Amino acid sequence: MHTMNGDNFANSFPKNPLLSRNSSSSNVIQYSDEFSPDEDWLNEHAAKEHEERIRRPSVNRAWQKNSTSGGPSVSLEKREADVASLGEVMDLEEVPRGITRQARQLNEYIFPKHRFRNHLVDEGKIPLVLVACGSFSPITYLHLRMFEMATDTIQEQTNMELVAGYFSPVNDHYKKEGLAPAYHRVRMCELACERTSSWLMVDAWESLQPSYTCTARVLDHFDEEINQKRGGITLSDGTKRPCKIMLLAGGDLIASMGEPGVWSDKDLHHILGKFGCCIVERTGSDVWAFLLAHDIMFAYRGNILVIKQLIYNDISSTKVRLFIRRGMSIRYLLPNSVIQYIERYALYRDAEPVKTIFYQSPFVRMEP
């Protein structure tokens, strides 16, 4: 029976030459274009997409010009007409084949496993599950891209095999500016995963909790569902192997670990010692300088995987919300289905307190 701890994680890095994503090795997440947004918008939707693209700026700026409070002032009739137009382009409530959506009530909650890979291609490797905790208000292409960057690094630098990836949006008790209701954020994450990925899932458990839930408890929840209830991965001989569960984190989450009073030492020891963390590094920065200055993170450096961002990407949810309030285009910053959802429910139109938008950090931003 394999055990998951910092020592065997550090020993999981291979001595063999690096694997290539395009190599004959089968340790590669299989991708499908079945739910690709490009395919959704071809043929019968192409003309409507073009019409919507032309229409969008005038619609976005209409409420801005008529409002003095920063919120929408478009008439109810016009908003209903806009929603009807969007509904013709894409049915956001249509659930693609094989997809299970999350419940809105905790007593109806079921752990999502419809895309969980139940076997290892290479049984000599450690099964890995990545969990991204955050606001996702809204989810952007960078949030999705972080999982892809992690996939490359894990495949090339470790002896682990990725079997699942999860988004875990925070609940409404996490008091932060610009936080849309949890059920909206969960649904936007589901739309993003359903229509752009063949392996990512959304878990609503954290968002359904009656009070703020710390990250350490969220990771315990995944360990309970995957390893304690399911036994992990079933090998070809019928035996079970527990999955390594790691936190996939960006800038605000990790940088906050170095701020006094934000995280308890007990939680940091639990997260970094029992589970581990994948940190997405900002292009041109040195994450190890930060780890060197943090006693607890340095102590668990063998259980931390640094993911370099080879193509600079600074999309943030904060900037997306700002663009929406200013009536600017957010196309190509987040999936089309998420954009349509935001417009359908008129999200992120309310003014937010003035703050620094262009945040500088050695890490990629995960929050807000």
UniProtKB/Swiss-Prot annotation:
Q: Where is this region: Disordered?
A: 1-25, 47-78
To which pathway does this protein belong? Answer: Cofactor biosynthesis; NAD(+) biosynthesis; deamido-NAD(+) from nicotinate D-ribonucleotide: step 1/1; Cofactor biosynthesis; NAD(+) biosynthesis; NAD(+) from nicotinamide D-ribonucleotide: step 1/1
Claim: Hydrolase is one of the keywords in the record:
no
Q: What are the recorded GO MF terms, alphabetically?
A: ATP binding; nicotinamide-nucleotide adenylyltransferase activity; nicotinate-nucleotide adenylyltransferase activity
Which amino acids does the record list as binding ATP?
H143, T318, K319, V320, R321
Q: Which residue spans adopt a coiled-coil conformation according to this UniProt entry?
A: none
Name any one Pfam family assigned in the record: CTP_transf_like
Reactions it catalyzes: beta-nicotinamide D-ribonucleotide + ATP + H(+) = diphosphate + NAD(+); nicotinate beta-D-ribonucleotide + ATP + H(+) = deamido-NAD(+) + diphosphate
Instruction: Identify residues that carry Phosphoserine.
Output: S36, S75, S85
**Per its Swiss-Prot or TrEMBL entry, what cofactor is needed?**
a divalent metal cation
InterPro entries the record matches: Cyt_trans-like, Euk_NMN_adenylyltrnsfrase, NadD/NMNAT, NMNAT_euk, Rossmann-like_a/b/a_fold
Going by the record, the broad EC class of this enzyme is transferase
Q: Where is the composition biased (Polar residues)?
A: 1-14, 61-72
Q: Which GO terms describe its biological process?
A: NAD biosynthetic process
Task: Indicate which residues the UniProt annotation says bind NAD(+).
Answer: S135, F136, T215, G250, D252, W263, R282, N313
Q: Which GO terms describe its cellular component?
A: cytosol; nucleus
The compartments listed are: Cytoplasm; Nucleus
- Describe the task this protein carries out: Catalyzes the formation of NAD(+) from nicotinamide mononucleotide (NMN) and ATP. Can also use the deamidated form; nicotinic acid mononucleotide (NaMN) as substrate to form deamido-NAD(+) (NaAD). Key enzyme in both de novo and salvage pathways for NAD(+) biosynthesis.
- Report the sequence similarity comment from the record: Belongs to the eukaryotic NMN adenylyltransferase family.
Name of this protein: Nicotinamide/nicotinic acid mononucleotide adenylyltransferase
Tell me what organism the protein belongs to.
Answer: Schizosaccharomyces pombe (strain 972 / ATCC 24843)
